[in-house]
Structures are given as C-alpha cells and as structure tokens.
Amino acid sequence: MAHSPSRVFAALSPSAGDVYRDENQSVFNRGRKQTHLSAQSNVRVIEVTGCAEISSPPDRACVSISVKNSKENVNDVTNSVTRRLEYILQTARQHDVKEENITVTKHLQRDEDLFHMQAEVLVVFLDFEKMQQARTVLIEKLDKSVCVGDPYYSHSAESLSLLRRRVCLEAVDNARLKASEACCTLGQALGRPLLVREEESREWSSSQQDASGSPLTLHPRTDATLISATSRMFVTFELRPKDNNRRKF
C-alpha cells in the first residue's frame, strides 16, 4: 500500500469559509475546489489526498493441447485424432472445466498420398491445482502425438474491474483516515464528505520472465503475472468543532 507524505495547512481563526488544505494539491486544483465550494461559503472544510496500491494475482490459466497425425486413409487419421480429443475433453470435464471454457479447432489436409489432421483444444482453468492435475494426466496417458502446452495466466474482466474498485475505495479510506487524524490534532471533528474526485489512476503488469530471461518455475510464474493498480483520490470533508471540548489556538 502506498501513502503520500503530506502536511495539512490550517486557518486557525474560526471565520466562515476556513479551509484546511493538503499541501499535495496543485494550485490549479485548489482553484477548482474553491470555485466548487463558493456556494457553501459558511462551511469550513479540510481537503486531503489519499493514495493506495493493490496487486491482484491471475484468476485463470489457459492451456493449449494439440493433436496431430498422418495416415493414408482419411477415416483412420480422423478416428485416431478423434479418440485422443475425446480423452482430452473427458479429462477437462473431470477437472471441473465448463463447456464454455473449452474451444476445439480441427484442420484436415491432403499431401499426395497422406492425410494430415491437426486439432487444438484450448482449455481455460479457474482452479490452478486442478489445471496441474489435468496436465499431469494428459502428459502421462497420451503418446507423443499429443503436445500439452504450458499454462498461460491471465486476468478476467471481472477481476480487473474488482481490482479498480478496491484500489479506489482504499484510497478514499486512506484520505478519510488522514483527515480524521489531522482533525484530532487540530481539536476539530470530521464531518461529512463534500467532494470526492479521482486525480490519478495507473495499472501495470509484471514480466513473465525473470531478469536473466530464463523461464520461471510454476509458482513464480503465477506471481510474475500480477497486475498492480494505484489510485490517488482527492476528498473534501466538512470541518466541525468538537462538542464541549473545542481547543483554543
């Protein structure tokens, strides 16, 4: 989690329109806030920024399984590839893969006296442990005409959307905590939020290989496909005097 260091400026006289400002905000942004709050001239406010950073691991793994064979008779080559495809599909279903996460592609061609058939199965696993179990079964049980590829880890649209919401909400919570602590120091009470605005957001993903360029092992490879997101939120809170215990400056 990333926090931005800041100091809070305070107008000490309790006149209308007092504003407690976070030093991090730009002059341009200050002008925008003052304009926004001009209609609430009797409201004292405190303005802060809050930052957050969250990383999310992949939630899906795609495995490509290819089958190829060549025979003089078209029925023979078709039957040979089909039997292996059926075993691959059965194995995927036994490891809780739904039909919508399985894609099968076939290609048949003739080269002089031989018929060549190729097929590819793309399987999307949501359970990484079962993915490894399924790969092990296929590698052990099928011959060299079947090639089981390495898993490719990725993030679903749903997990990315959740990541963006989480980092935004955490940045707002950090801003609220910062404002609350500043109010305690100043002998004031934190009121309701008057303005919330996201000032910056970024996302980035890690490399799938280490610095030396060599392939990573299974667990580091999963970690290496992390997607990280940061958010910086600007929040304006109403500032209220503490009941029965207002500090004198």
From Swiss-Prot:
GO terms for cellular component: cytoplasm; nucleus. Its main location: cytoplasm. Pfam families: SIMPL (PF04402). Keywords: Cytoplasm, Nucleus. It comes from the Eukaryota. May be part of a signaling pathway that leads to NF-kappa-B activation. The gene is irak1bp1. It is found in: Cytoplasm; Nucleus. One of its GO terms (biological process) is positive regulation of canonical NF-kappaB signal transduction. Belongs to the IRAK1BP1 family. InterPro entries: IRAK1BP1 (IPR030312), SIMPL/DUF541 (IPR007497). This is Interleukin-1 receptor-associated kinase 1-binding protein 1 homolog.
